[in-house]
Amino acid sequence: RKVVEQLFERNGVLRWDAILAEVQNQNLGETDLETLHAAIEKIPGLVNLGKPAVNPYFTTEENIERENYCIDIVNQTKGVCNDFASDYIPFSEAEDTFDHSAQIEVIDQIVQSKDPFAVFRGVAGAGKTSTLQELCKCLKKGGVINIHVVAPTNSAVDVLRSENFESAQTMAMFLQNKDKLPPKGSYLIIDESGLNSLRQGTEMMKLAMENEYRVLFVGD
């Protein structure tokens, strides 16, 4: 049961063989395969999603509840916020000759959004960091006083701080220090958001609802 809990901390859905393999690995051969197979099937809250029949997908009741919560919140809060009236032109201070039109389009969409939750996806090397830097300038010109950046690991935080995101901190630290949360109405940027667990993402969305945060999930 402990192994399954650990697996689903980082995975929303897993195939049966992946679960069984990890249980076997941590069991170190002390229990035969048939006994392990039967024990896993009896774990409370484990849900068989079916298909393919020979190696079905599994999740947990807790994960389903979290996913449903996140989906419901996103749907219920669409269009409830004001957009950011910013007169800053992204990359107007750039000294390079690079074509920033795609990045500017992304920034415009985010700034003009009336949803509390937004997503920014881009492959490695697509210019996400410079886009976020310009986005922050737009947000500040649009009246946003507090912008906070959150990342999954200490190394990612170090990189962000070196790129002038001085307030960057880890997701774990952010969620643990609830007495030191940013003030209401802050703008949160969740970098490499796909590396966070479903539990962390759900907690972040709950905090956003409680504190009127706007949240941008960034990843590839």
Where on the chain are the PLM-derived regions?
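Conserved ATP-binding/catalytic motifs of P-loop helicase motor domains
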Residues: 1-220
